[in-house]
């Protein structure tokens, strides 16, 4: 009886364990790279060197630059930022800050990270570098220091600008971020 139970367990264990393995997901992205974070081993990829628009991934670098400026003592989380008309008029996702108000760096960072706020990204850029384009230059300097050789930022939001090149990057460069 014990042998029959053991054989039954072995057979059912094999059947049920196979049923628990899901099919791999379909990925519609034209370019992607999946790595093991600890070993940096590539698990799967598709066109990882293809340059693509970054969109809101740009805000990771925006937040990184702001955090570094705080750590270097150039600004503090309590530093107040005047909101310009240009930032107030930003399209896309926003934290809905009003022109002429003052908002702390801390609150703007939350707006960038939690709400993907283009208005907050704009305000931080203006405070730190004087303009969005000057902040993009600063972002590109950081990208170069991080070894992101295929990266080009044109603004702190990731929004496309018809007058400028698109913020672009390759999936393999993003591993550095």
Predicted regions and their residues:
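Active-site-adjacent loops and short helices of periplasmic peptidoglycan-processing enzymes
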Residues: 18-165
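Acidic, Ala/Val/Gly-enriched low-complexity intrinsically disordered segments
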Residues: 175-177
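Conserved small/polar residues in nucleotide/adenosyl-binding loops
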Residues: 166-171
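C-terminal segment of classical bacterial N-terminal signal peptides
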Residues: 13-17
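Sec-dependent N-terminal signal peptides
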Residues: 4-12
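Residue-level marker of positions within ordered structural domains that often coincide
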Residues: 5, 67, 117, 172-173
């Amino acid at each position: 009886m014990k042998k029959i139970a053991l054989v039954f367990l072995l057979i059912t264990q094999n059947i049920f364990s196979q049923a628990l393995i899901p099919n791999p997901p379909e990925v519609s992205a034209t370019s992607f790279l999946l790595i093991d974070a600890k070993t940096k081993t590539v698990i799967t990829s598709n066109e990882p060197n293809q340059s693509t628009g970054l969109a809101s991934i740009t805000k990771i670098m925006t937040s990184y630059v702001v955090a570094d400026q705080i750590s270097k003592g150039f600004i503090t989380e309590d530093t107040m930022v005047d909101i310009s008309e240009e930032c107030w008029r930003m399209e896309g996702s926003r934290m809905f800050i009003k022109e002429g108000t003052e908002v702390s760096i801390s609150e703007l960072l939350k707006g960038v990270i939690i709400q993907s706020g283009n208005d907050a990204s704009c305000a931080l850029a203006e405070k730190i570098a004087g303009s969005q384009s000057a902040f993009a230059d600063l972002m590109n300097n950081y990208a170069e220091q991080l070894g992101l050789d295929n990266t080009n930022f044109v603004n702190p939001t990731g929004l496309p600008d018809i007058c400028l090149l698109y913020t672009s990057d390759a999936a393999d460069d993003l591993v550095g971020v």
